[in-house]
Amino acid sequence: MIPSTYPNNSTMAAMTARMLLDIRAVHFNTDEPFTHASGLQAPTYIDCRKLISHPRIRSTAMDFLTCKVMRDAGLEAFDNIAGGETAGIPFAAFVAERMALPMSYVRKKPKGYGKTAQIEGEMPEGARVLLVEDLTTDGGSKLKFVDAIRNAGATCAHTAVVFSYGNLPETEANLAAHGLTLHSLTTWADVIAEARRGSDFNEATLTEVERFLSDPGGWRGDRGLNTD
């Protein structure tokens, strides 16, 4: 793979946003907000895992993600590609294949039998590992996976995702404080811009979603929703 043969990063961001919209991975509902794993409600939901069921779009998105990592971090920056259990595993496999590198995966916690391993696959001591996931919000789950990688004797200074929320400045700051650089293909801003160009959602919905993204706590508070 030669990164210079691919579109620039902003074009790849827009194209990835369009692909996510086309496979109906993006959901907005301002009347009945979605409840996320954190327990907080939001009018936005994205399911990047749908990519694995759409081969042509999946292939393009994984080409783009691999290209972005190689542009940002370098062609020879890694020795191993690791996926986080479970959503990150297929994406790590796709990236590892494109970079011709070994792949492993990281469990959320050590298994309670056998060798009680938390890292599956071979990850040599000192290996430079790229952690691949489907998306990131506040980056919290990434840090747990990175800690497991580092505790296994490898190094991990980079994580790559298809989608980053992009409206939480503390995310990259939190990751950077732990020595981790985030590489993401596309964000909510890219998705909304593409949705507006393609008329995927009405303008009232997009405007309300933008209000939420600019002030999530205020948006929830105005509706009497949990803000903690």
Curated annotation (Swiss-Prot):
Gene3D superfamilies: 3.40.50.2020. Pathway: Pyrimidine metabolism; UMP biosynthesis via de novo pathway; UMP from orotate: step 1/2. CDD domains: PRTases_typeI. SUPFAM superfamilies: PRTase-like. Keywords: Glycosyltransferase, Magnesium, Pyrimidine biosynthesis, Transferase. InterPro entries: OPRT, Or_phspho_trans_dom, PRibTrfase_dom, PRTase-like. GO terms for molecular function: magnesium ion binding; orotate phosphoribosyltransferase activity. Homodimer. This is Orotate phosphoribosyltransferase.
